[in-house]
């Protein structure tokens, strides 16, 4: 089971936040995450793994402040120790930075690049945020592997279409270039013929 929440920015952009029911489900979330996903976890404490799905083309720096705080409050609320504390640090990083090796326990992860891990602090629990998120909560049983394949297939099709469009434009540019070269060549030929014609006319005048 995966829990889904909806968060909105001040400019009305909506984002999906999701988390697994337990550490075993977290394994699938780690395995089938998307490049657009940002992972959240309470720093140095046990907590849920919360993911934020960005819009295509967005980066971690583009996360709206209010959406970032929604994610941080949600992950803090789902930490047995963290939910009782103030000034809790929450780490977050792109899904692609998560490292999972065979010797790690279930639900445990590391990072490929520590420099890509950011921290946000939740000073204290804000019920208004949690209540708002709770109203959007949905429980689903998604086929994560199929969803990931569908996303990757769509990306491949988009790239294929972009390549085809690029080739079409290149072909069109080459055609225009050939036409311009032919036009310049024809213009040069006409100039030469005109010069020859004028030269012939001058010769005739001299003989007269």
Curated annotation (Swiss-Prot):
Transmembrane region(s): 106-122
N6-acetyllysine PTM sites in chain numbering: 23
Disruption phenotype: In the context of cancer, mice display reduced metastase formation, without affecting primary tumor growth.
InterPro entries: Jlp2/Ccd25 (IPR039730), NFACT_RNA-bd (IPR008532)
Cellular localization per UniProt: Cell membrane; Endomembrane system
Gene Ontology molecular function terms on file: DNA binding
Keyword Protein biosynthesis: no
Coiled coil feature spans: 117-187
Region spans: Disordered: 144-208
Post-translational modification Phosphoserine, affected residues: 204
Subunit record text: Interacts (via cytoplasmic region) with ILK.
Protein name according to UniProt: Coiled-coil domain-containing protein 25
Organism this protein belongs to: Mus musculus (Mouse)
